[in-house]
A protein has these predicted regions:
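Conserved, mostly hydrophobic/aromatic
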Residues: 18, 25, 36, 83
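A short, Lys/Arg-enriched amphipathic alpha-helix followed by its capping loop at the start of a domain
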Residues: 24-30
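Alpha-helix N-cap and loop-to-helix initiation/capping positions
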Residues: 13, 17, 45-53, 153-165
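Generic enzyme active-site microenvironment
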Residues: 34, 183
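Conserved anion-binding
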Residues: 41, 61, 78, 86-181
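A short alpha/beta connector and helix-capping loop motif
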Residues: 41-76
Length: 183
């Protein structure tokens, strides 16, 4: 039977009790801890959150892997060095913001600091955005929801293209990088 990985996400926690919550999630059996970092452009409702200070603060409370999913338009060597030194095990980037040479440098920096690297295909980001990078990443995350216009509001519903996207991404991973995890 396939083991389903479970993460404890920290985006909406009480930061005054974050250490206790991480320890509780660890004891409950999560597979890894999911931290976030955001800037002033993406995720406007969670501006300037996360980063190496959070990872450094929670590292003593878990031996599980900690991943940092960034919602930014920039990621430099210093940021990667800081989160790695704080105890981060994987950096996850939005594929639509990091392409070409900048992504190649980021992948190399992650490897230099002993971290894994993942890419997220956000809402309506085409699979072709990771066509070259798939060879060098450890995880591909797919966001399979999109705007649902059934009631005229911006609700997040299941995208009609989701099943096809999942199938095509699985085929890409199987053909190009079978060690890459898909979520």
């Amino acid at each position: 039977m396939k083991h389903i990985k479970m993460a404890a996400g920290l985006a909406h926690v009480d930061y005054g009790h974050i250490a206790d919550l991480v320890a509780e999630a660890d004891a409950a059996g999560v597979d890894y801890i999911h931290s976030d970092a955001a800037d002033m452009h993406d995720l406007k409702n969670m501006q300037l959150m996360g980063g190496h200070q959070i990872i450094e603060g929670i590292r003593p409370y878990t031996k599980k892997d900690i991943e940092c999913h960034i919602y930014t338009r920039d990621c430099d060597r210093l940021f990667i060095e800081k989160i790695a030194a704080a105890g981060c095990n994987m950096l996850i980037l939005p594929a639509e913001h990091f392409l070409g040479a900048p992504l190649a440098y980021i992948i190399n920096y992650c490897r230099e600091f002993g971290m894994k690297i993942g890419l997220t295909l956000g809402c309506y980001t085409p699979l072709c955005f990771v066509d070259e990078a798939i060879y060098d990443i450890d995880r591909l995350q797919l966001v399979v929801h999109g705007v649902d216009d059934t009631d005229g509001k911006d609700n997040w519903g299941w995208r009609r293209s989701a099943v096809d996207l999942i199938r095509r991404s699985r085929e890409m991973i199987d053909a190009k990088n079978p060690k890459c995890r898909s979520e």
